[in-house]
Each structure stands twice: as C-alpha cells, then as structure tokens.
Amino acid sequence: TLTEFYIEVEGKEPGTEALKKIEEKAYAMTRKDTHQAMEGFIHNLNTMHSRGGNQVVFSSINYGTDTSPEGRMVIEELLKATIEGLGTRGEVPVFPIQIFKVKDGVSYSEEDYKKAMENFEAALEGKMEFQAPNFDLFLKACRTTAKALFPNFMFLDTPYNKNEKWDIKDPKRYRYELATMGCRTRVYENIAGEKSSLGRGNLSFT
C-alpha cells in the first residue's frame, strides 16, 4: 500500500498531506502513461497494415458509458490524442473509427444540457458539476468531433437500440449496449439467441 511504501522509504507514518501528494503524483503519472498509450493506440492503427498489405486495419472502438475512474481516464485521453492527431502536423487519424455512446443518465441528461448552454466555456473547462457522470465527456467528445471529425455518436435510447436488460447498477451493463462498426454495420439482433454486440462481426455483406 502507499502507507507501507512511505514507511519503508521515509521510516515513519505518512501524514494526510503526504498521502495527498503521493496520490496526486501517482494520478498524474498514470494519466501521462494513459495518454501515451492512447497516442500509441492511434498511431499503430494508422500504420499497421493488414495481411493484404494495401491498407491499414479497418478498426472501430465504441465508448462513452464507462463511469469508472480508469474508464473515464481512457476516454478522456483518447479524445485528447485524437485532437492532437498524427505526426508533427497533427493529421486527423482515420482509424480507429470512434463511436461515442450517448445514454440518458450516463453520458447525457436534458438538465445537464440546459445547464451547460448557460455557460458553455465553463462547462468545457470542467468548472461545472453535472448529474450524468459522463456528460462532461460527452461535451469533450463534441469538441473533438468539431476539430477531428470523430467520434461519431450513437444513441442507446433510440427504441430499436434499447435492451430491456440494461441496468445502470449492473457493472457489466456493457453486455446490453449496442456497438457498431465504423462501416456503419449494426450487429445486435440475434434470431438464434440473446441480442448483443459482444463477439459479433461480419463474414460477408448480403
């Protein structure tokens, strides 16, 4: 633990202030590492060629509803890396195709929207508290789209995208969330079992 590590290094129990500084430094280092990982993720998917050799891998990533601290950090740093772009000229990365999932009560609420519109700059700068835990990420996603074309947006509350088993209290609720591919393919319904996007894909188009 942090306390045990501090005792080993300093030879005494850490105070509240010391623990706070340790936590802040660890958090900053983790954020930096996460950002570099997202930069590498985008770079690799725009430079690694498929086995055909004539194009990069057509890849997609869906996100927006993970409210855990680590999940939110990954989303935020991915958005930042997308705005930064590729190389010294900051070229817009084509891949992965990014899809931000909009879900009422998670990444959107009408009340939060109205509040943000009263002072949009303050909302973007993180100076407001919102009801929906990921509404701030939704705003950052909109800003990213305005600058870098991605992410696209998918609305999980659209009647044909809803899953009656989705529960905000379920830590594995992602199993009941629709995910799409960048080619706009929506693989979700299932005539032979439970509808889900997990483990699904295309073999051919019909």
Report residues per predicted region.
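Conserved catalytic cores of very large enzyme subunits
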Residues: 1-206
